Amino acid sequence: MISLEGKVALVTGASRGIGAAVAHSLASHGVHLGLASRSGDDLGIEGAVAAPCDVRRPGDLESLASATAERFGGIDILVANAGVGAYGPFLDLPPDQLEEMIDVNVKGTLYAVRAALPYLLESDGADIVTLASEAGRRGLPYEAVYCASKFAQVGFTRALDHELSEKGVRCTNVCPGGVATDFAMGRGRTPEMPELEGMMTSEDVAEVVLFVLTRPRNHRILETAFRPVAEPSWG
C-alpha cells in the first residue's frame, strides 16, 4: 500500500453520492482536491479548489484542471465520476434523456481525461479511475442506452491503458453493482423495486477507489467489479 499524502486529485461529479464519498476519503488521506460539479460545492473540504462545472463543456473542465494544477503544482489522479441515468423500455426513452446520457457519461468522461491528461503525464505516478458500472460489463434490461454509455466508458479506459501504461499513467475501470444514492433512484425507478434492496453505500465504492489508488506502482488494476451480496452474480 502506497501513501497518497500530498497527491492531487481532480474528481468530477463531486457534489454528492459516490463523488462526494470519494472526495472525503481522499481528503482524509492527505490528497489535495479539485472538485467538479454543477453546483460548485467544495464539500467543506479545507483548501479544495471547486467551481461550477458542466462536464459537457470542455472549457469548464480545462479551467478547473488548470486552476487545480496551479494551486497544487500538478495533478496526479483523475476520478471521472460524473454520470446520469434513465431507465425503462428503449422506445419510451425521451430523446433528451438519451442525449444527456451520451453527453454526460461518454463525452463528459472523454473531456475530463483530455483536461487532466497533460498534467497527469507530468506526474511521477498518475492514475485515471473511471466510475463505470456493472452496466458497462453486461447488457441489462430497460437500461439499453445507459449500458451503451457505460460500455463506452469501459472500452475507452481499457484502450487508454494500452496508450498510457508505459508513460506512468494507470487506467482503471471501477464497476460497482447497485449503490444506494440519489442516482439509483433515477428516472423510471421507484423505492419498492426489489433491485433497490440491499444496495451498497457510496462509502463502499470509495473504499474500492482508495484500494485501487494505493496499490504499489509496479502493478495496476485494469477493472474491478463488485456488487451487493443480494444482487445476482450473473455467472
Residue ranges and their predicted role:
Residues 113, 149:
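Active-site helix of classical SDR
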